[in-house]
Amino acid sequence: MNHNLYLNMKRQIILFFSLALIFVACQNNDQLQNKINASLLKVKNKFAKDTRITIHSVSAKIENNSIILFGETEHKDSKKEIINSLKYLNLKIYDSIKFLPKIENINSIGIIRISVANVRSNPEESAELSTQVLMGMPIVIRKISDDWFYVQTNEKYLGWLSDDSFVQLSPLALERWNKQKKFFITSLFEIIREEPNEKSFPVSDVVAGSIVAIKNYFGKWVFVELPDGRTGYLPINSGKLFDEWKLNTIANASSIESVAKSLIGMPYLWGGTSIKGMDCSGFTKTVYMLNGIQLSRDANQQALEGNEIKTDTNFSQLRKGDLLFFGRKANKDKPEKIIHVGIYLDSGNVIHASGLVKINNLSPQADNYSERLRKTFICAKRILPEKLNILEV
């Protein structure tokens, strides 16, 4: 055999077996990665079924016959469970998972200082609007990225706030703020002014649901302090003492209808939860909040609250104030998916935010009939008469 031909064949055989070994190793790594990912998912489903309200983002990679864990979680037990679930693989495990909150040298509690603060999905102004938080509401700081803070709202929702949206409070300042009497804004929109007259320059705007501290009364005006220390005057009829409002506010079908109808024509805003703009669940959340009941943020979260009401094609079992949920019905290929919510009024009428806050009807005979709503109806939940998650600040 020609010597060169022999060497060439030998090189090809070596190359073939080398590639085969690499292929087998890659397959083994892929299988191993799949096992690791399955363990991570199992732990996630146990400790953080909803990452909109729970911090848990853990990944793993395989390097040099070892497992490297990285990411973050708010559950110490989840870290332990992840490591224990991977021990059977008999590989060295490097734990680089961060435990949150781990905030050093800052005050971890903040109070919203502007009428409506925009919470975003990522730390940049161009990021998707996730939700909004109103003036006077507390937030918990979980982590920081430059001028952005990853925070948790009072309904547990997570997202990013810019640093000028809120004021961080020391324990002493927080105690002082909490001890002050609060004024709860019931008007849809109002201006805090420098002096007690309507021609005075503005200090800030406020919207329904905003909370400020009350300092004194001046005839038809009330002297208030904002969370960041700014002061000014509000018309006395723009709100009520918060403790009195909370004590005397009794949510019922009529009050739900009244507040809901007062928002007719308000613009739709994805991620909005204020009178400046609201999405479907932001609308229902706002209506119930102004009646003293705190709902979860998103439609599919709200669908987990209250008592389910069985309905027929005439919707005769529904009562005013019930929440109606819409979306994709379950089929053999896909699970049920709730994407819209509205409030039932009467005679088939549903008030909801879609483009703007409006009333549609579920009956084909009605002038304001919505075929889309009827075809996508999934379920109804009754929040009243039970008072769930009473609004706290």
Per-segment meaning from a language model:
Residues N84-K102, T153-F184, N197, E225-V259:
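Boundary regions of SH3-family modules and the immediately adjacent low-complexity/disordered segments
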Residues L295-I359, Q365:
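...with weaker cross-activation on analogous glycine-rich loops/strands in unrelated enzymes
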Residues Q12-F17, C26-M137, D163-L169, A173, ...:
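N-terminal targeting leaders
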Residues I112-M135, I185-I214, Y268:
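Beta-loop motif signature
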Residues A260, G272-N291:
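Active-site nucleophilic cysteine motif
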Residues I68, Q132-S162, S204-I236:
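SH3/SH3-like beta-barrel superfamily modules
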